[in-house]
């Protein structure tokens, strides 16, 4: 049986953790080497890229930006900064026009400092913040630099105090924190009502497929796999490519440097066979040559 290799783009359903989705894919394919590209909270739906087999080694090279569509609820604060948590306060809804709300959103665009939610995956003294928060601990989490490239107001419903937004942001951005901080700036409090991720690591909503059903007890993995996988190079369209001759491919599989070709101005280069099969990633050595960094089908 050929080892599966590639990316599955899952439309994560509400109610499941990202880890639970990975565990189901492991069971379905019968392999352990499976990882996801960016945690989604259980209540959040949408694009969850899952790397299968040696494609897990490519995750650090994928673009980290993500895009979300969500609803922010003004007038309510919770201990988790979303409506999944316990309500901490209720305040009268602000009388805002769409133009005034746009002004309130302006400070959150660009490079900003953001404090993660108390219930988050941030490490505090070697432990996840959410574990300490659920024990009732209050933590002074430091602010972190993040970038919100685009923040669009899609709809504003003043009667309900809900605004629908689209956010294109850097890795490490918390939309729950955005909702909390917007409400704080407006003086009424706020939290996240719902959220869907529409783009992650270069994968789009249109590519996402439903999470496969849980395999029956005793079921065995299939060949080919019962899960469609995108070729690994599809996730690396932002990187230059180099095709190797049969002789160069032999050197590559043994971990040897590839002799100079065209100059590559990039931190990494996708290496392909003559037929277009991905062989791994190389690092330019400054002379036009490539040093192997990630080698699929390595020998010796």
Swiss-Prot record:
Its signal peptide is none
CDD domains under this entry?
PseudoU_synth_EcTruB (cd02573)
Alphabetized Pfam families for the sequence:
TruB-C_2, TruB_C_2, TruB_N
NCBIfam families recorded: TruB
Protein's recorded name: tRNA pseudouridine synthase B
| Reaction catalyzed | uridine(55) in tRNA = pseudouridine(55) in tRNA
The active site annotation covers: 41 (nucleophile)
Q: What species does this protein belong to?
A: Synechococcus sp. (strain WH7803)
Q: Which one of the record's GO molecular function terms can you name? A: RNA binding
Q: Write down the EC number.
A: 5.4.99.25
What family is this? Belongs to the pseudouridine synthase TruB family. Type 1 subfamily.
- Keyword terms of this UniProt record: Isomerase, tRNA processing
Q: Which GO terms describe its biological process?
A: mRNA pseudouridine synthesis; tRNA pseudouridine synthesis
- Explain the purpose of this protein: Responsible for synthesis of pseudouridine from uracil-55 in the psi GC loop of transfer RNAs.
Q: Has UniProt tagged this entry with the keyword Isomerase?
A: yes
């Amino acid at each position: 049986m050929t080892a599966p290799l590639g990316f599955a783009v899952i439309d994560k359903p509400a109610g499941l953790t990202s880890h639970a989705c990975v565990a189901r894919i492991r069971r379905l394919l019968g392999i352990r080497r499976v990882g996801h590209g960016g945690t989604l909270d259980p209540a959040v739906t949408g694009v969850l890229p899952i790397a299968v087999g040696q494609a897990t080694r490519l995750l650090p090279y994928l673009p980290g930006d993500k895009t979300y569509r969500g609803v922010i609820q003004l007038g309510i604060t919770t201990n988790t900064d979303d409506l999944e948590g316990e309500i901490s306060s209720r305040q009268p809804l602000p009388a805002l026009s769409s133009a005034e709300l746009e002004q309130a959103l302006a400070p959150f665009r660009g490079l900003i400092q953001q404090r993660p939610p108390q219930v988050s995956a941030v490490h505090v003294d070697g432990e996840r913040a959410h574990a300490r928060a659920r024990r009732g601990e209050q933590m002074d989490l430091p602010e972190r630099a993040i970038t919100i490239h685009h923040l669009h107001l899609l709809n504003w419903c003043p009667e309900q105090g809900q605004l629908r937004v689209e956010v294109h942001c850097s890795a490490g951005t918390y939309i729950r924190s955005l909702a909390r901080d917007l409400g704080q700036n407006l003086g009424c409090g706020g939290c996240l009502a719902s959220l869907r991720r529409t783009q992650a690591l270069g994968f789009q909503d249109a590519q996402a497929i439903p999470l496969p059903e849980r395999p029956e007890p005793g079921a065995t993995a299939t060949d080919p796999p019962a899960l469609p996988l995108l070729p690994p190079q599809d996730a690396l369209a932002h990187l230059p490519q180099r095709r190797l001759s049969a002789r160069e491919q032999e050197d590559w599989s043994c971990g040897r440097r590839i002799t100079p070709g065209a100059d590559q101005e990039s931190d990494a280069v996708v290496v392909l066979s003559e037929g277009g099969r991905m062989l791994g990633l190389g690092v330019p050595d400054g002379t036009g040559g490539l040093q192997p960094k990630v080698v699929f089908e390595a020998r010796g």
